[in-house]
Amino acid sequence: MTRATALLLALFAGASTQAAGVDVTVTDASNRPVDQAVVVVEPVGGAPAPRSSGLRSVIDQQNLQFVPEISVVRTGTSIEFPNSDQVRHQVYSFSPAKNFKLALYAGKLYPPLVFDKPGLVTLGCNIHDSMIGFVYVTDSPWFGKTDAQGHVEITAVPPGDYRVRLWHPRFAPDEAQIERSLKVPVTGDANLPVSLKRALRPEPGNNASNKWKGY
C-alpha cells in the first residue's frame, strides 16, 4: 500500500466516523411520542471529549414562561436570561449545579451566566411562582431533545460503547432518569427505541402550587 493510498483510507475512515449517528425514539406507556425529552450519549470507559470554549445559549422570558422551558447544554456554556415581558422577573436557582439569583429586572440587565458544573438546574422566578424551567448540563458533546414525534438524531458520534441517559420532568418518579447501553457501529446509524413503563405525569396547569410539584 502506498503512502498516498494509506492517507486516503485514513481520511475516508475519519469521515465515516464523523458521519455515525444515534437515532433515539421515546414513547410513553401508551405508545405515544414523548416530546422534549433530554437525550445524552456518554462514552463508556473512554476519555471524555475536551470541553469547548465560547458555547452560548439563551433562555428568554415570554408570557410569564421560560422559553425554552427545557434546555440541554454542555458544561461551560454561557446562558443569557433576557426578559421580553412587560413585567419584571427575578430569576433564581437553588440547584447544586448552579445556585444563583438575578435581582428584579427587565430587558437585558445581566451578562450571561456560565454553567460550569454538570447536573440538573431548576429555574424559578421569585415574583411569579408558576414560572419553572430546567437546564440539563452535561459533560458530553453528544446530546439533544426529542421532537413532537418523540425522535432525536445525534450526529458525529464515534464508534464505540456508550451509555444513553434520558430525562424529562414528567417522567414517573421510578423512571426519573433512564439509562440504556448502546454500541455505535463503525458505519451506519445506531437506533435506540425507548418505551416508558409508566405514564407521564400530568401536564402542570396554571395553579402555581401544583406546577412541577417536587421540583
Q: Model-flagged regions — what are they?
A:
Residues 5-16:
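Bacterial N-terminal signal peptides
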